[in-house]
Every structure is written in C-alpha cells, then in structure tokens.
Amino acid sequence: MEILSLAADEVNISNLASLQGKDIVIISLQPWYYNIGSNCKDIATRLAEHNRVLYVNKPINRKTWVSKDKDEGIQLHYDIIKNNGNKIETVRKNMWQLFPESVIESINWLPSTSVFKKINFANNKRLAQDIKNAIKELGFEDIILFNDNDIYNGFYLKELLSPSLYIYYCRDYLRGYDYWKKHCDVLEPELIQKADVVVTNSEFYASYCSQYNVDSYYIGQGCNTKIFDGNIEYDMPEDMRNISYPVLGYTGALDADRLDENIIAAIATKYITANIVLVGPELANFENTFLRKFGNVHFLGRKALKELPAYINAFDVCINPQIKNEITKGNYPLKIDEYLAMGKPVVATRTEAMRMFEPYTYLSDSPSAFVSLIEKALAERSDTLNNERKAFAGSHTWEKCLNELSRVINKHLSE
C-alpha cells in the first residue's frame, strides 16, 4: 500500500499557524493528569497555541471505581466525581482537561465481541454525554475529534458526537497485547475504516492502516529537544553517584511485552564490569523479573520527565533491548530520538521501525551481538559522532509533525 504524506504545496499551508480557530476534542489512553510525557500531550499542547483544545481523560471503569487500590491520578479523578467537584480544569491558555463523571462498565472480560460492542455502545454514550456537556459549557462548536489510539472509548464517538472531522491516531499496535487482542482484532480495523482520517507516527503503521482506510497518513514524530538538550551541563543524579563506569542505561517503562530480559541478562553476564541502569516504572509483568539476581543491574524507578536528561547524560551507552514481536515491530521508539538528542551512542534491537535510525545507531540481531556492539559503541565515541546524532534527532521536530497534521486536517476539511 502507498503511504500518504502531503507535500506542502498540495494545500495552501506553510506552517502550523495555518490551523487556527478550531475547537478540538482529544481522547487518549494517556490521561493528562499523569506526570508522564506522551505524543498526544505534545500534540495537544501545540494545537492549543492557535486553537481551543479539550483533553478528555479516560473515564473510570466500574472495576477501578470499587477498587480500594487506586493510584494517585485515579484517586484525584474519583474524588472529583465523588465530591461533585469541577469536572473541567484549565491546563493553560486555550486548553482544558475534562474529568468524565460517568463510570463505564468493565467489559473486556466478555468472550463475545458482539455482546462487547453492544455494551460498549452504552459506555460510549455515557462518555459522549459528558463531552457534550463540557463543550457546551466551553462554547465549542463544529468540533474536530482526535482519537489517540483509544479503540474502545472512541469507537462510537463519531456517530455520537458528529464531529466535522474524526481523526484516528495510531501510534501503538494494541492488537499485540493479550488484554486488547480479544476484541481489538475486530474493532480496530472497523474503527480505522470509519475514521475520516488516520494519522500515524511510523511508516509501518501507515502501511498497516492503509489496508482499511486509504486516507492514512504518516505525519512523522517529534522530539522535545528543549528538554533533551545534549549541549548543556547536568548534575549527576544522586542515585547514580556510586555506580561505576561503564554505565549502560535505559529509560522508559519496564514492560515484559516490550523488553527482552534475556538480552539484559546476557549483557549482565558477559560484560560483568558494566553496570546496567534501568530508569522507569515497572509494569506488573516485570515486577518478578529474574534480572534482580544480577548485582550489576540497577532498578532506579520512575522519574519525572524533566529529570530524564540528567540520567541519559550519565549513561556511557544507551540501550533499547526490545523483544521482537508484533508490538515492537513497527513501534516508533521515541526514546531513541531522546538518546540521540543527548549525543549518546545507542545500541538497540533491529526492528522495522529502527531502520531509519541505522546510520546513527548500532543495531543488534541477537543477545550476543548486543554485547559486542556495546563494546564497539564505547570504543568509537567521538565529538563528531555525538554532533551527528544530535543533528539527526534535531530534525525530528514537533513543528514538522504538527505542520503535516495541519495539512491533513485542512485538506480534508476543504473537501
């Protein structure tokens, strides 16, 4: 399938500012209230520079509502509903977040997808009503609906909200996860097909989506080089001061569906003089990892986004030891851009999505090769290579990404 990407002269648009005065509603799997960076947050923030944006947090499901073990973000949302607090909160100029007050039913366990769809329609109606109430209060009209990979909560919102444009943003292969695949194998192709426009952050996903919708566009990916700036000095993080050279570092969620524990174990075993530092929250599927038995593997936990550059700066080599599966095959590895923006040598698993990074990274096809490439990366370090990496990452800007998104939106609104 041909991957669509609009040329600047295809529509009369030259920059992001050309998308102005629109009312945009965004739904996402990533709630705004979590202090975690995401593509959708970056897109929302930039859209709000010239448009009004309502960022809709995920509705709380029944199972979570009755649970006594709520995390801080969910507890905040729960308390707002329970205490009849303000459901709309100003994030910044032209941007608000919505805490939906409706509780939706927990239905992923249902074996029948047809039954799931019927109850999911009722769930979507509840969410749609919350959104309608919010856009009425804010005075939004003729909305554009941007769905950030939320297949279930956004499945019927095109019909229920009648937006001027329904955009589906595909940036993750959810069908590869056990939780999602039961109903996602049916629902995502249907959602892609009925979306007015599909945009993706990788060429692989654009090709995948174009099977179901010819209006599928690769819009690129941005990297926040204002945060990940390899040209400034950083203090050594306190919890890394006693970790000796060479430090091989990873930042991001520790997820057994994405990370290959065997690669990390091979590095720890074969390169015993090295220290492997893992910075990020542990998902439930990683909590009992056998990697804890290695004395040279360090788990430093979740860090705020603004803290990550100091950790990356302290790494001698950055690693992305992904497991090869349907989830990682086409997933754009944003962390690679962040590593390169800091000028760091990078060793990563070779995947389809990593092909574009090959001239600036060391790509491994096996655990044993990973160790050899780390040693090569350490030996070849130079200011020249560091600057080439920074320049390459710097070419992946959110401005370019949002310009492309703006072109797509304006093209389809004018049809």
What spans do the regions from the language model cover?
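Nucleotide-sugar-dependent
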Residues: 34-38, 306-311, 318-340, 348-359
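Membrane-proximal helix-turn-helix segments that form the acceptor-binding/catalytic region
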Residues: 43, 126-136, 181-198
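A short, active-site helix/loop in glycosyltransferases that binds the activated sugar's phosphate group
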Residues: 155, 195-218
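Carbohydrate-associated surface elements
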Residues: 204, 219-225, 231
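Conserved donor-binding/catalytic core segment of Leloir-type glycosyltransferases
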Residues: 240-258, 268
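Nucleotide-activated donor-binding/catalytic signature segment of Leloir-type glycosyltransferases, i.e.
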Residues: 286-310
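A charged, aromatic-enriched C-terminal amphipathic alpha-helix characteristic of glycosyltransferases
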Residues: 382-411
